[in-house]
Design a protein with these regions (language model features):
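Short N-terminal binding/cap micro-motifs at the start of the first secondary-structure element
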Residues: 12-17
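Long, charged/polar, surface-exposed segments that mediate recognition or autoinhibition
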Residues: 37-45
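Well-ordered beta-strand positions
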Residues: 19-21
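Generic short beta-strand segments
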Residues: 46-50
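Short, well-ordered, aromatic-rich surface patches in folded extracellular/luminal domains
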Residues: 1-10, 23-26, 32-35, 51-109
Length: 109
């Protein structure tokens, strides 16, 4: 089971450190804490899995990059890193954490 996730985003517009404490259902964005609804934790996990699959193996030369560390209950750390990429839904991801009544729309192609 996931206990904690750390997300570090670096690009010219965002230098964010996000932590998500699954046990206490608290997310922190640059030292500002937010309570996270349990259902949103599933969305967060789904989004991070998408980022890992879509961006996590890229190794470009751009200044945009992200690193995500996932800590499980056995204290195992899984890390993935994307460089030269930037998750397209990152701003919405932050909005979902910050605004507890935000309703995201799932895009189906």
């Amino acid at each position: 089971m996931i206990e904690l996730i750390e997300i570090n985003i670096n690009n010219p517009f965002n230098n964010d450190l996000i932590t998500i404490d699954y046990l206490n259902k608290i997310a922190t964005i640059n030292n500002q804490s937010y309570n996270v609804k349990p259902g949103y934790l599933n969305y967060i996990t789904h989004t991070l899995t998408y980022w890992q699959n879509e961006y996590g193996t890229k190794n470009g030369i751009d200044i945009e990059e992200f690193t995500i560390k996932v800590y499980d209950d056995n204290k195992k750390i899984t890390t993935f890193h994307g460089k030269g990429v930037y998750p397209s839904n990152y701003q919405e991801f932050k909005t979902i954490i910050k605004e507890p009544n935000y309703e995201w729309k799932r895009k189906i192609n």
